[in-house]
C-alpha cells in the first residue's frame, strides 16, 4: 500500500466526464515537437533513401536461400553492405551505437529445405538515462519472386522491403549522433518471406535476456502511396496496424478481459494511439485496428508472440502486380518489384513518422507498470494504483479516460507524482488509463489497469 503522501483524490462530475475535451483538458499524448525533434525530421533525406533502395536492388536477388558468399549478388552481399553502412553511421555516435551481425542456423522448416544461416544486422543506440528501456524498428532485407522457393531469379524487392530497410538505415544515420534517453535498436532482419525467421530469433533473444522492449515497429512495404492504377489517392497516408486483444494473452487473462472489457486497450493498441498523437505534419497515420492485413503478417508478429507491444507500418494501397512477382511484361503490364515504382519522398515521410514516434517514446518516461483498479470494495468512485517510475526527470502522472464506445482517450487529468489516486467516476461507465509525464512535458503511452487481486 502506498503511503498517504503518494495518494491523491480527484473529483470529476458526471457532467464533466461526458462533456467535450475542453472541460477536462486535452487527452492527446503529443506535445509540440521540440527543437531537437524538428532538426531530426529535417535531416531525413529522400535522396539518401533512394540510394539505399537502389543499392539493395543492385544485388539482383536477396532471397534468404541465395548466395551468402558472392561479393556482388545475393543476400550475403546485401548483408555485408548493410553492415558496413551501419558501422559507418555508428562512427558518428561517440561509441554509443554498436553494430552486430546476429546469425543463427535455421533448421529445416516450411520454406527452408536445408539448414540455412540467417543473419540480422542490428545497430543499437544506447540510451543515456534509462538504457534498459528498449525501442525497436525493423525492415526486412530479404526478397522473393512468384515462387517463394526460387532463389535464382532476380528479386529486386524495392518496395518489399528495401523501402523498409531504407527507413531503418536512414533513421540510424540521423539518430547516431543524438543522445536518446532510452535505447533505440535499428534492425535489418532476414528470413521474413520464408516465415519471419529472423525477427522470430531476434524477439526470442530479447525474451531470453529479459529485455524491456516497450515498443517495436515493423516497416514493411512502405514504398509508395500510388494506387494500382497509378493515381495517388493517399500519398500522404501510411497505415499502422495494431492488434487489440494481445496475441500473447493467456487463458487466465482472457477470462479477466471477458469480465471487465478492454478488447481495445492492449499495449499495442495504446502504442497506436501514441503514434497518432505524435505524428508529424505532412503525413496522416491511418491506424487500423487489426493485427495486420487480412490473413497476412510481418515481423511485428514475432514480437507480439513474446508479449511485446508492436505495430506494422505499410503503404495505403498495395500494388499486387509489383509484389511477390517475377520481373516480366505481360499483356503490356510491367510486373515485378522495381525501384522505378517507389516514391522516395513518400518513404522519407514514413521515416519521419517513425522518427517522431521513436524519439518521443525514447525521451518520455516508460509506460507505467503495475496499473490496477482497486476492487476490494464496491464503490461508485474508482481507485487506481501503479508503481512509481524511477526516471530522474519524472514529473508525475495523468489519468486518462473515455466513454466505452469511444476509440481514443477523451479526457485527461494531471494527478501529480503519486502512485495512487481516487477519482469520483465509476469504473463501470468508462475505460481508464495512466500515463507518465516528465519535466519537459513528454508523455508515455497509457497503460490500461487490470483489476487488483
Please place each PLM-identified region on the residue numbering.
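Beta-strand-rich modules
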Residues: 424-442
Amino acid at each position: 500500500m502506498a503511503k498517504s503522501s503518494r495518494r491523491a483524490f480527484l473529483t470529476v462530475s458526471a457532467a464533466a466526464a461526458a462533456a467535450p475535451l475542453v472541460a477536462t483538458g486535452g487527452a492527446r499524448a503529443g506535445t509540440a515537437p521540440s527543437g531537437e525533434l524538428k532538426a531530426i525530421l529535417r535531416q531525413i533525406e529522400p535522396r539518401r533513401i533512394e540510394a539505399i533502395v537502389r543499392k539493395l536492388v543492385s544485388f539482383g536477388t536477396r532471397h534468404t536461400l541465395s548466395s551468402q558468399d558472392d561479393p556482388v549478388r545475393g543476400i550475403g552481399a546485401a548483408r555485408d553492405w548493410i553492415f558496413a553502412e551501419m558501422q559507418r553511421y555508428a562512427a558518428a555516435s561517440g561509441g554509443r551505437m554498436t553494430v552486430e551481425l546476429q546469425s543463427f542456423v535455421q533448421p529445416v522448416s516450411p520454406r527452408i529445405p536445408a539448414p540455412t544461416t540467417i543473419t540480422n544486422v542490428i545497430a543499437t543506440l544506447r540510451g543515456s538515462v534509462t538504457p534498459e528501456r528498449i525501442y525497436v524498428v525493423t525492415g526486412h532485407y530479404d526478397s522473393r519472386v512468384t515462387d517463394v522457393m526460387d532463389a535464382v531469379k532476380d528479386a529486386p524487392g524495392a518496395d518489399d522491403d528495401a523501402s523498409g530497410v531504407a527507413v531503418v538505415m536512414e533513421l540510424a544515420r540521423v539518430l547516431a549522433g543524438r543522445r536518446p534517453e532510452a535505447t533505440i535498436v535499428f534492425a535489418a532482419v532476414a528470413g521474413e518471406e520464408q516465415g519471419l525467421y529472423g525477427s522470430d530469433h531476434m524477439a526470442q533473444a530479447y525474451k531470453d535476456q529479459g529485455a524491456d522492449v516497450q515498443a517495436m515497429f515493423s516497416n514493411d512495404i512502405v514504398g509508395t502511396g500510388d494506387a494500382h492504377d497509378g493515381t495517388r489517392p493517399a500519398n500522404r497516408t501510411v497505415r499502422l496496424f495494431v492488434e487489440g486483444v494481445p496475441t500473447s494473452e493467456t487463458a487466465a487473462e482472457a477470462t479477466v478481459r471477458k469480465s471487465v472489457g478492454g478488447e481495445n486497450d492492449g499495449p499495442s493498441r495504446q502504442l497506436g494511439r501514441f503514434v497518432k498523437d505524435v505524428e508529424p505534419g505532412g503525413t496522416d497515420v491511418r491506424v487500423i485496428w487489426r493485427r495486420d492485413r487480412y490473413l497476412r503478417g510481418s515481423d511485428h508478429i514475432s514480437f507480439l508472440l513474446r508479449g511485446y507491444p508492436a505495430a506494422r507500418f505499410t503503404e495505403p494501397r498495395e500494388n499486387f502486380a509489383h509484389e511477390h512477382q517475377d520481373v516480366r511484361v505481360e499483356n503490356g503490364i510491367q510486373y515485378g518489384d522495381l525501384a522505378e515504382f517507389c516514391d522516395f519522398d513518400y518513404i522519407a515521410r514514413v521515416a519521419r513518422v517513425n522518427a517522431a514516434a521513436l524519439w518521443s517514446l525514447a525521451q518520455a518516461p516508460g509506460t507505467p507498470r503495475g496499473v490496477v483498479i482497486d476492487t476490494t470494495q464496491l464503490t461508485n468512485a474508482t481507485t487506481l494504483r501503479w508503481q512509481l517510475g524511477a526516471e530522474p526527470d519524472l514529473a508525475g502522472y495523468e489519468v486518462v479516460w473515455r466513454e466505452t464506445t469511444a476509440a481514443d482517450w477523451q479526457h485527461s487529468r494531471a494527478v501529480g507524482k503519486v502512485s495512487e489516486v481516487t477519482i469520483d467516476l465509476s469504473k463501470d461507465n468508462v475505460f481508464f488509463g495512466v500515463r507518465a509525464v516528465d519535466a519537459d512535458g513528454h508523455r508515455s503511452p497509457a497503460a490500461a489497469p487490470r483489476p487488483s487481486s
